[in-house]
Regions:
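Active-site beta-loop-alpha junctions enriched in small/polar residues
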Residues: 61, 87, 114-118, 219-222, ...
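Generic structural signal for well-ordered alpha-helices
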Residues: 43, 71, 94, 98, ...
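Short catalytic-loop micro-motif centered on adjacent basic/acidic residues
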Residues: 57, 81-88, 248-252, 273-276, ...
Length: 376
């Protein structure tokens, strides 16, 4: 049995090996917007935003005013991309980041928030209409929803990957809204519930973050269907926010059907970035979309890189076959989440991976993957 020193040396060697196999980072002379550049961190260009973001970004779900000190350490180590949303801790995530920005400086980080209530509000409105309909019409709509979900391919086991308990229910709710919009869309005040909701959400985020602009805004937050992304009111709100100087670039996030949603975002033209589920389990479904994103300069940030192969908070237990897949792809003593992040960072079409880092130990561990590749 190896000694502790031997194990640490073996682990360090494994980490160095993982770093060596990453895709090429942006060179020091790369054009674009640099923030918080540190010699121990690698950066990649986020599509046509021009932002040079750290290869590992800070997930915001665990951040709060009383839980943000480790984020200060991450900034000191070169991390420069913060992800958050109003729904994280009911605004506490944004408030926690505000303390970091105040301590380290707004010009050192890229801030991304989202419009968390957009799709939830839309689904609520259509569910209320659905509940008022006669039983035969409800039956027809349910049948149409099932057909559309099955034909979309979004339910394939390795594609949907089941990252959280209500993922399939969210897809069903979004699909019901899509189907109902074709006949009952006129009952919705789209200006109020689609466009104005976005404007109000951004004002709230700016207030909680203590800033007057976002570098990136994602809407919808957790899109489930391509139809959700196509609403013209989203583009109209984006343009108002851009002209007001409140948001610089726009994106979308998606756990479910990430390829379909990414391709739709590319086709629409007003999206400069997307944060989608990318991992060793769903990767085979994403090739065409990732290629198109690179050609269109739509920056891709990977989330849920580790969720299919690691229990995380304990609410998900990955299958042995999935764990074995990442162990074989990235051999050695690294922890499974690190292997999952390292594997995704091999893909040059991905700008960064998002990691939920809840303490200083995880910051040091995970940011080690973003170290520059060895020369030669």
């Amino acid at each position: 049995m190896p000694s502790r020193r031997e194990f640490l040396e073996f682990s360090a060697a494994a980490l160095a090996g993982a770093v060596a196999r990453k895709a090429e980072a942006a060179p020091e002379t790369a054009d674009g917007e640099w923030r918080n550049r540190q010699p121990g961190m690698s950066y990649r260009r986020l599509g046509r935003t021009g932002y040079l973001i750290s290869e590992v970004g800070m997930g915001g779900n665990l951040i709060a005013p009383d839980r943000h000190e480790h984020v200060l350490l991450a900034v000191d180590m070169g991390l420069n991309y913060f992800d958050t949303a109003p729904v994280y801790g009911e605004g506490k995530s944004e408030q926690g980041y505000a303390l970091v920005v105040k301590a380290r400086g707004r010009d050192r980080v890229f801030l991304n928030s989202k419009v968390s209530l957009w799709d939830l509000n839309r689904n609520r409105l259509y569910q209320e209409i659905f509940d008022s309909l006669p039983a035969p019409e409800q039956k027809r709509l349910r049948h149409a929803v099932r057909e559309r979900m099955e034909s979309s391919g979004a339910l394939e086991t390795d594609y949907i990957a089941d990252y959280f308990k209500d993922q399939r229910a969210e897809l069903e709710a979004a699909t019901l809204s899509d189907v109902m919009a074709e006949r009952y869309g006129g009952r919705i005040d789209r200006g109020k519930h689609y466009r104005q909701l976005i404007l109000d959400s951004v004002d709230g985020s700016l207030r909680r973050l203590g800033t007057d602009y976002l570098d990136l805004l994602m809407c919808p937050h957790g899109a489930n269907t391509p139809t959700e992304v196509k609403h013209p009111e989203i583009a109209e709100a984006f343009e108002r926010l851009r002209k007001a100087g409140k948001v610089r670039h726009f994106g979308v996030s998606a756990h479910t059907n990430p390829a379909g949603i990414l391709e739709t975002a590319i086709d629409l033209g007003h999206y400069a970035a997307a944060m989608i589920a990318v991992n060793i389990i769903n990767h085979r479904y994403l090739g065409k979309a990732l290629d198109r994103a690179r050609q269109a300069e739509v920056g891709v940030i990977a989330m849920k890189a580790a969720r299919p192969v690691h229990p995380g908070d304990g609410r998900y237990e990955p299958s042995p076959a999935r764990v074995r897949k990442i162990q074989e792809a990235v051999p050695g003593p690294l922890k499974v989440p690190l292997k999952a992040y390292a594997w995704v960072l091999r893909d040059a079409r991905v700008a960064a991976v998002i990691s939920e880092m809840g303490d200083a130990a995880l910051v040091r561990e995970n940011l080690g993957l973003a170290a520059p590749r060895p020369r030669g």
